[in-house]
Amino acid sequence: MRLIPLNQAEQVGAWSAQHIVNRINEFNPTADRPFVLGLPTGGTPLNTYKKLIELYKADKVSFKNVVTFNMDEYIGLDTNHPESYRTFMFENFFNHVDIQEENINLLNGNTDNHEEECQRYEDKIKSYGRINLFMGGVGNDGHIAFNEPASSLASRTRIKTLTEDTRIANSRFFDGDIAQVPKYALTIGVGTLLDSAEIMILITGHNKALALQAAVEGSVNHMWTVSALQIHPKSVIVCDEASQQELKVKTVKYFKELEAENIKHV
């Protein structure tokens, strides 16, 4: 596992965006051989999306031959609801770059058969071989996507019941009213994520410090699903100083020395 210890959340956005651009450009995607990118929602990746849009407008990258898969979606929210993850992605990223709409893949939380929808999503991912790079965030309790504590580390795309802690955290997007936050969601599984060629997780803020500690210094544990990154052959965590507060000083020093060349220009 790589750890990229930065100072500010804005630097996390800049580093992660440049990493995505580098991977896309190195891959040199075509219509017949697209780059497959996994994407999250939430507050943490907003800086990354802003920087990606800047890099696109500066002609540093094209998303024309990029296929995307999102991590999750609430069940029961209208497609055009302001807090649906579909709305989030179009408003904060898709509408601002040259991605083709037919290359955008989003879970549908309003189908009559959720299990069928989850299998369709898994099959669609497999039709591309695998996801080349999956970017994600992490919850205060260490969950990735909506794989809440005690989720199977071999899990696939499925329905999940959201914990009260997650719903309280997400209520900030629903005028602070937890009653408006859906109780269920469709989410990729931990196993689905681990099938990706590369995983990049963004962690920012004091409230994520315990999750970062569990991911880096703890054991692989289904109570902290982010810890599954330890068994992935190519994973990277990009974090700000606030989220590093629970890490040992020598851990941060070790990774700063390892990644000195990769972070000096951020």
From Swiss-Prot:
InterPro entries (alphabetical): Glc/Gal-6P_isomerase, Glucosamine6P_isomerase, Glucosamine6P_isomerase_CS, NagB/RpiA_transferase-like
Top-level division of the source organism's lineage: Bacteria
Key words, A-Z: Allosteric enzyme, Carbohydrate metabolism, Hydrolase
Pathway: Amino-sugar metabolism; N-acetylneuraminate degradation; D-fructose 6-phosphate from N-acetylneuraminate: step 5/5
Catalytic activity: alpha-D-glucosamine 6-phosphate + H2O = beta-D-fructose 6-phosphate + NH4(+)
Keyword flag Glycosyltransferase: no
Parts forming coiled coils: none
Notes on activation and inhibition: Allosterically activated by N-acetylglucosamine 6-phosphate (GlcNAc6P).
SUPFAM superfamilies associated with the record: NagB/RpiA/CoA transferase-like
Enzyme Commission number: 3.5.99.6
GO cellular component: cytoplasm
Marked site: Part of the allosteric site: S151, R158, K160, T161, Y254
Catalytic machinery residues: D72 (proton acceptor), D141 (for ring-opening step), H143 (proton acceptor), E148 (for ring-opening step)
Disulfide cysteine pairs (residue numbers): none
GO BP annotations listed: carbohydrate metabolic process; glucosamine catabolic process; N-acetylglucosamine catabolic process; N-acetylneuraminate catabolic process
Any one Gene Ontology molecular-function term assigned to this protein's record: glucosamine-6-phosphate deaminase activity
Quaternary state and interactors: Homohexamer.
Function text: Catalyzes the reversible isomerization-deamination of glucosamine 6-phosphate (GlcN6P) to form fructose 6-phosphate (Fru6P) and ammonium ion.
Family statement drawn from the similarity comment of this UniProt entry: Belongs to the glucosamine/galactosamine-6-phosphate isomerase family. NagB subfamily.
Record-linked PANTHER family: GLUCOSAMINE-6-PHOSPHATE ISOMERASE (PTHR11280:SF5)
Family annotation (HAMAP family): GlcN6P_deamin
Protein name per UniProt: Glucosamine-6-phosphate deaminase
Organism for this UniProt entry: Aliivibrio salmonicida (strain LFI1238) (Vibrio salmonicida (strain LFI1238))
Name of the gene this protein is made from: nagB
